[in-house]
């Protein structure tokens, strides 16, 4: 394996792009390998090395790197008819109607250009709709590069988590631990009349895939209803990945007031969306008074790719395939970790998976255990080992993942996300043979 071309490209990139990348998560150590093209479930780098890909663009690529023919045909058709028009298009209406038919919370939807733009708009909408300022977020949750949610601390001592954000912004945000019923209850007892919304991922999908414990999402639904606050689910990652076309909210049986989307809803193209109850969403301009607009919003090529991607999933065995392989992969990694690396906790569901390296070994591997990744099941003998909060993942052996495990898997030509926090994904292009090969690599690397 040689990296000569990637190294040369990295040196060039360093002179014109900060850190040599356009997204910090791509800055793998000691330097990134530069991808030239994708092929099915694989990517090929600038040096011609082929990797089995589980990054999948960090989530948007439900089908891998070869789109189904109807999706490709739609993309080509809309591209040939002109890049954009500055006016509404029929495909926007079709895509919006499809999403509204399948996602429980969505009666109306506004398409935007990224997941970050979706969550920024959702926070503004919640404040405009309720007339309140405070937003509750989960520690370890991620809602894009926006000032309202890049915070750290606790409700009494909140600070921005990055330079460049005034402290005055952070005072309107209340961070609490995910899965902590007492903490969220206390926040509402103290600030309930000022809380515009609770903004949370139904699963902490950007921080080790932390699933909700039984009753937690239901408790959020109850508290927000009681205090006339909004419940916003950030399904940028889980949308149309977990729970199929109904998204994670349908899998867990909890319907939020507003949902944000990104990634899969655009079929692999830049996209975001805010959907929810009609009486809330119509507060966006021009029907309401909460300003929201964008030059590229509802871009026809993106709308066509997203609509045809979801339509194909509705008509074929896409979710059965990816979820079966995801369960098989998590189960296989669980068996390997039990034998070779007791400190490794396998997390994920449906077609998502990750391995978290805890600093202490498992309390037990005997008796009733989750066979294909942590399910937050109290009867499981490893329940106490399973991450419950973002802090549980942040305190794990992140350096083992980045400096040892990721490099070992790359040596086996397996492309995983480069830190312990980001999820990995099985696509429709993956096969049972790919899973076999991946498990052999895990066996060696663990």
Swiss-Prot record:
Any Pfam family the entry gives: Aminotran_3
Record field: catalytic activity: (S)-4-amino-5-oxopentanoate = 5-aminolevulinate
UniProt cross-references to SUPFAM superfamilies, sorted A to Z: PLP-dependent transferases
Cofactor(s) the protein requires to work: pyridoxal 5'-phosphate
Subcellular location: Cytoplasm
Domain of life: Archaea
Residues with the N6-(pyridoxal phosphate)lysine modification: 263
EC code: 5.4.3.8
PROSITE patterns found in the cross-reference section: AA_TRANSFER_CLASS_3
Keywords: Cytoplasm, Isomerase, Porphyrin biosynthesis, Pyridoxal phosphate
The protein's enzyme class: isomerase
GO biological process: protoporphyrinogen IX biosynthetic process
Any one Gene Ontology cellular component term annotated for this protein: cytoplasm
Similarity comment: Belongs to the class-III pyridoxal-phosphate-dependent aminotransferase family. HemL subfamily.
Protein name, entry field: Glutamate-1-semialdehyde 2,1-aminomutase
Organism: Haloquadratum walsbyi (strain DSM 16790 / HBSQ001)
């Amino acid at each position: 394996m040689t990296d000569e071309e990637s190294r040369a490209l990295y040196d060039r990139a360093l002179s014109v792009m900060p850190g040599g990348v356009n997204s910090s998560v791509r800055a793998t150590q000691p330097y990134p390998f530069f991808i030239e093209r994708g092929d099915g479930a694989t990517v090929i780098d600038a040096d011609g090395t082929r990797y089995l890909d589980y990054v999948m663009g960090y989530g948007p690529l439900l089908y891998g790197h070869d789109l189904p023919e109807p999706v490709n045909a739609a993309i080509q058709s809309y591209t040939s008819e002109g890049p954009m028009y500055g006016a509404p298009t029929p495909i926007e209406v079709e895509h919006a109607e499809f999403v509204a038919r399948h996602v429980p919370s969505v009666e109306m939807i506004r398409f935007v250009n990224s997941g970050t733009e979706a969550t920024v708009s959702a926070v503004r909408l919640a404040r405009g709709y309720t007339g309140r300022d405070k937003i509750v977020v989960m520690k370890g949750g991620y809602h894009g590069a926006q000032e309202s949610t890049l915070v750290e601390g606790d409700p009494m001592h909140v600070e921005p988590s990055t330079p460049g954000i005034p402290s005055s912004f952070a005072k309107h945000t209340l961070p609490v631990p995910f899965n902590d019923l007492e903490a969220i209850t206390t926040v509402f007892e103290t600030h309930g009349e000022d809380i515009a919304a609770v903004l949370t991922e139904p699963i902490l999908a950007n921080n080790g895939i932390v699933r909700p414990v039984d009753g937690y999402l239901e408790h959020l639904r109850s508290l927000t209803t009681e205090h006339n606050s909004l419940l916003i689910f950030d399904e940028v990652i889980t949308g149309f990945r977990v729970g199929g076309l109904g998204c994670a909210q349908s899998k867990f049986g909890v319907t939020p007031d507003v949902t944000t989307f990104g990634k899969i809803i655009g079929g692999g193209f830049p996209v975001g969306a805010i959907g929810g109850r009609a009486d809330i969403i119509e507060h966006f301009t021009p029907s309401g008074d909460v300003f929201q607009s964008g030059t590229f919003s509802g871009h026809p090529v993106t709308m066509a790719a997203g609509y045809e991607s979801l339509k194909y999933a509705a008509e074929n065995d896409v979710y059965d395939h990816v979820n079966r392989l995801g369960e098989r992969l998590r189960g296989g990694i669980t068996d390997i970790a039990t034998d070779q690396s007791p400190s490794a906790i396998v997390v994920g569901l449906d077609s998502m998976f990750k391995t978290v390296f805890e600093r202490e070994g498992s309390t037990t591997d005997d008796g009733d255990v989750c066979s294909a990744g942590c399910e937050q099941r109290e009867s499981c003998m490893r329940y106490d080992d399973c991450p419950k909060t973002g802090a549980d993942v942040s305190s794990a052996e992140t350096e083992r993942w980045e400096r040892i495990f990721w490099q070992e898997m790359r040596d086996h030509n397996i492309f995983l996300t480069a830190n312990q926090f980001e999820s990995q994904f099985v696509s429709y292009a993956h096969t049972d043979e790919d899973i076999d090969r991946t498990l052999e690599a895990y066996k060696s690397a663990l």
